C-alpha cells in the first residue's frame, strides 16, 4: 500500500490530481486520531485512484493549512505508517515552516522537482544547499531530482547542462518529458499519459524505492 500525504502549508493541490472520493483532510485525521484504529477506518479519509494510490488531502482553507504544524504531521504519519508500506509527502515550497522539520526528520529520501529553466534549476539547487547547511546532507545525497519539462519545446542543450549539474549533487536525476495532462494541472490518469511520461514515472518510483532505508 502506498499513501501520498499533502502537507503543503500553502494550500496544497495534490488531491486535485485524483478523483476525490473523500472530502476529509489531514485536519480531520488529527481531530479523530484516537478513533482511527484500522485500515478500513482510515480509508474513509483518503481518495484512491485507478493505480491504487491513496491520497490524503490538505485543507483548502489557507489559514487552516498554514496552521498544520509538525505535531499534526507526526500524528498523521504515525497513523499512516501502521497501514502503509510507503508514505509519500508533498510538502510544497514552505521549507522553513515547522511542518518541514517533522517531514525531514522522518524522511528516508527526497524527491526535488525542478523545472527546465535556469531560474527553476537555480531555486532547486538552492534548496539542496539549504538542506545541506541545516544538517540534512545525508538526505541530499540520497535525493532524486525530477527534471520536469513543463513547457513544450524546452531546449535539450539547456536540459543537459541542468541535468549534469544535479548529477554532481544527488543520487539520480530523472527527466519527466512534457505531457499535456501534467501541464494542465488537473486530474492525472496514469494510463492516458504519454508512454515516455509513464516510463519516467516508473523510473522515478524505482529510484525512490531503491533509496529506502531498510
What are these regions (language model features)?
Residues 185-214:
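NTP-binding/hydrolysis catalytic cores, primarily Walker-type P-loop NTPases
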Residues 82, 98-118:
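Inter-motif core of Ras-like GTPase G domains
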Residues 1, 130, 135, 210-214:
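Acidic-aromatic/histidine active-site loop/patch
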Residues 48, 54-99:
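Phosphate-binding/switch loop-helix module in NTP-utilizing enzymes
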Residues 57-58, 89-90, 112-116, 144-149:
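Conserved beta-strand segments of the P-loop GTPase G domain that flank and frequently precede/overlap
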Amino acid at each position: 500500500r502506498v499513501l501520498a500525504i499533502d502537507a503543503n502549508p500553502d494550500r496544497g493541490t495534490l488531491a486535485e490530481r485524483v478523483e476525490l472520493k473523500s472530502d476529509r483532510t489531514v485536519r480531520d485525521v488529527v481531530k479523530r486520531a484516537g478513533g482511527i484504529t484500522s485500515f478500513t477506518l482510515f480509508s474513509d479519509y483518503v481518495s484512491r485512484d485507478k493505480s491504487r494510490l491513496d491520497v490524503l488531502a490538505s485543507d483548502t482553507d489557507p489559514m487552516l493549512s498554514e496552521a498544520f504544524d509538525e505535531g499534526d504531521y507526526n500524528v498523521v504519519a504515525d497513523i499512516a505508517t501502521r497501514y502503509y508500506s510507503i508514505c509519500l509527502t508533498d510538502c510544497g515550497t514552505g521549507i522553513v515552516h515547522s511542518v518541514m522539520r517533522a517531514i525531514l526528520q522522518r524522511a528516508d529520501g527526497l524527491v526535488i522537482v525542478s523545472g527546465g529553466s535556469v531560474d527553476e534549476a537555480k531555486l532547486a539547487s538552492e534548496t539542496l544547499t539549504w538542506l545541506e547547511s541545516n544538517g540534512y546532507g545525508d538526505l541530499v545525497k540520497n535525493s532524486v531530482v525530477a527534471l520536469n519539462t513543463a513547457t513544450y519545446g524546452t531546449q535539450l542543450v539547456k536540459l543537459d547542462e541542468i541535468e549534469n549539474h544535479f548529477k554532481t549533487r544527488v543520487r539520480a536525476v530523472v527527466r519527466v518529458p512534457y505531457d499535456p495532462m501534467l501541464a494542465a494541472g488537473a486530474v492525472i490518469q496514469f494510463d492516458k499519459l504519454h508512454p515516455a511520461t509513464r516510463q519516467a514515472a516508473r523510473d522515478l518510483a524505482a529510484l525512490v524505492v531503491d533509496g529506502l532505508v531498510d
